[in-house]
Amino acid sequence: MNIYRTHTCGELRGSDVGKEVKLSGWIHRKRDLGGMLFVTLRDNYGITQVLANPGTDAYKVFNDTRIESVVTVEGKVLSRGENINKDMPTGEIEVEATSVIVQSAADVLPMQVADDDNAPEETRLTYRFLDLRREKLHNNILLRSKVIAGIRKRMIEMGFTEFQTPILTSSSPEGARDYLVPSRLYPGKFYALPQAPQQFKQLLMVSGFDKYFQIAPCFRDEDARADRSPGEFYQLDVEMSFCTQDEVFEAMEKLFVSLFTELAPGAKVTGPTFPRISYEQAMNRWGCDKPDLRYGLEIEDVSDIIAKTEGNFLKGAIDSGKAVRAICVNNVGDKSRKFYSNLEAFCKENGAAGLATLIYTDTEVKGTVTKLLNDEVKAELKERMKAQSGSAILMVADEKLKASVILGKLRIKLADELDLREKNAFRFCWVNDFPMFEKDEETGQTIFSHNPFSMPQGGLDALLNQDPLTIKAYQYDIVCNGIELSSGAIRNHKPEIMYKAFEIAGYDKSVVDEKFGGMIRAFRFGAPPNGGIAPGIDRITMLLANEQNIREVICFPLNQKAQDLLMQAPAEATEKQLKELHLKIVE
């Protein structure tokens, strides 16, 4: 028999009235009403109201004990009668305390637990163990556990096998800075913490395993963002042998539709398949490679219509080789001039020369360019953009991609301001056909645009005969509600193709052999075609929890400066430790 409790704090119901029970938990709140002391007791499972009568030992102990102290309460379950609290699962009952034992007394709290008091992030992270007691954050972490358990169950049901890959490995050029671990036995040499288990999961396919998955920790020395935690993160790492891109898509669609339907009951979830959007389409129609499909405002190229006009700056832009692209916003015909001037200022902040507007009403067409365009052009624009009375067509003239990117940012701003996003919905899509290479803006060098291990479309022939910037890769992202959940690819499993791809990106054969020698050697002994993907656990949970910041779904995250305020990391090493590792700190 458990000496601390007979029931949890979320367990008792009306059917338990009259029972003698024992509960243990944290003192959540205390209220003195007419001499009667009411205490809410909290544990992992819920809250139960406890009452202590004046003059009793229980009353004295509760009265002398601070909020958030841990206590064990013995007492009798009573009915609340007509005073039921319908907001609590245990709201039909209360426990009349006959004995209270303090298991651990709390000091004065540096932050409130029972109330969301908007404590500074520094305080929350320094006292994360208190922060994690708060209901919302506590539930987020429990949801994260359900996400991982649900993923594991479904992956096994689909025939995948779970593996564990090394944490200490070698450094590789995968796009972010490595965390390095100095070797004690080999002076001057370092291990690296894996940015991802990329090489190991491909080696498992070469080893004859068929379907791999792992809830994998990944380590990248990169700056924080709202949707990216510095230091480390977890991903569902997946790899499949003898698969095509479509088969990877099918497995992930099955996983996500089922998982989100279970963990977000009542929500609208895209399915059973997800729309497929090429990278080029995404940039042209949404102005980014992470389209949010919960609202419209798709970008259209209206250059052909504007080209029919004369003597205006829009036509001048087209004549100089630029494009005019547009979005249509409904129900904004009555917005003030300031509303539109703010939109133009936003576009200018993001690199536009200006924002051209046409505002359609029942009787006229207003806006900054209405006098520059004839009635036929305005009517054609209205038809192309599916505008109606109260709609506004917003146009940017610039280089094709730049115009789309500016409008892409504008559509996000409008969705925020006008509350355009579909509620309680998870709208998934695939973005595929990414470019294999891109130009580095600073150096002008050709570099990999995404995953260097991807198979180029067209294989070795494309690498030998095409302009590298025109080559597409078998790369794909899964996006939900404008958030990239994962990147994936069909892998390059042929050494000759890998050498050529890295050569184009500026890597000598000797560098490839040094950095990826283990994988290259393996590929010379028979490697199956393989592909995979790696959705982020943190971002999946963030979506399901409806959180805007990824730190709200991680137990012990680093702060924006990559510091662990609770454990005081990073910390200085001792002279003894440095000596053992053959290191010296140089000022």
Predicted regions and their residues:
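Class II aminoacyl-tRNA synthetase catalytic cores and aaRS-like
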Residues: 1-587
